[in-house]
């Protein structure tokens, strides 16, 4: 497969993380002949104080709703029409909430040329009749293109502020992974490419469940020792889940990359899932209410992923093997007391 340069890039999504990535790509392509100098970014159109969000981004070069305070390069062009945004794109960067991936892929299927490559930055999983489905699998099936994944300890505002961090690209085709590394790497955004792509992607989804448990601990003022236990036992459940559900062999080394333990730590200390879970305990409000209040209406991935994982575990009759994942689901959706997160640790199979 040979893509003729300069390669056109389209970012499918423009939330907090999508806008931070747009800032990186916009700056990078200016200095590289391999990539086209204009970057399309699909924006779900919204009205902000009577003005269209796309108009604000294209004139003021700032996503004032989802990444305020950070200027986007002028070569990043916001487009409200998804088909227009992806037209003629060689490289597609998927960065939308995971529940919208089916609709987006259906809309652009057949409208992207057959040699295009995708990379998903979406942290979530889906479920089908056979159980677990990865987001990359859905894109691959619906669009018939090769798809890599990027996951890591990457809190969007810190990335946009150009604070140093690492990330992991998982790609079953190493050359495709290296191409995306070339597009995305900066002195402060360092990338490792591995071929264990399914594990990389699962890490990105499952760590959000663990972060919700960490937030519950913070809400209960459990202390750092308990939170460390949540992180360790959460990591053990992530590894066990990957071993059961990944089609290809799982490398434990992948969990030591940025997508694994590093992302888990940063999310359990600094991410939105932790923050909202703590507020859930302290305020008694529902997850939905807190999303509106604290996230500008953006969706929290951790509780949703816990529900999908729970249903998959039920299908396999394995709920009891994953007490931390199960407790998060039951606290979020079944009204179980938050203290159950502690009792699930006390009787965790890791200690038996």
Swiss-Prot record:
Chief subcellular location: cytoplasm
Documented EC number(s): 1.1.1.8
UniProt keyword terms in alphabetical order: Cytoplasm, NAD, Oxidoreductase
Active site: 207 (proton acceptor)
Function: Plays a role in regulating cardiac sodium current.
Annotated catalysed reactions: sn-glycerol 3-phosphate + NAD(+) = dihydroxyacetone phosphate + NADH + H(+)
Alphabetized NCBIfam families for the sequence: glycerol3P_DH
Residues bound to NAD(+): 13-18, 156, 272, 299, 301
Any one biological process term the GO annotation gives: carbohydrate metabolic process
Annotated family: Belongs to the NAD-dependent glycerol-3-phosphate dehydrogenase family.
Location in or out of the cell: Cytoplasm
Keyword Cytoplasm among UniProt keywords: yes
Pfam families (UniProt xref): NAD_Gly3P_dh_C, NAD_Gly3P_dh_N
Residues where substrate binds: 123, 272-273
GO molecular function annotations of the record: glycerol-3-phosphate dehydrogenase (NAD+) activity; NAD binding; protein homodimerization activity
Organism ancestry: Eukaryota, Metazoa, Chordata, Craniata, Vertebrata
GO cellular component term, pick one: cytosol
Name this protein carries in UniProt: Glycerol-3-phosphate dehydrogenase 1-like protein
Superkingdom field: Eukaryota
Cross-referenced InterPro entries: 6-PGluconate_DH-like_C_sf, 6PGD_dom2, G3P_DH_NAD-dep, G3P_DH_NAD-dep_C, G3P_DH_NAD-dep_euk, G3P_DH_NAD-dep_N, NAD(P)-bd_dom_sf
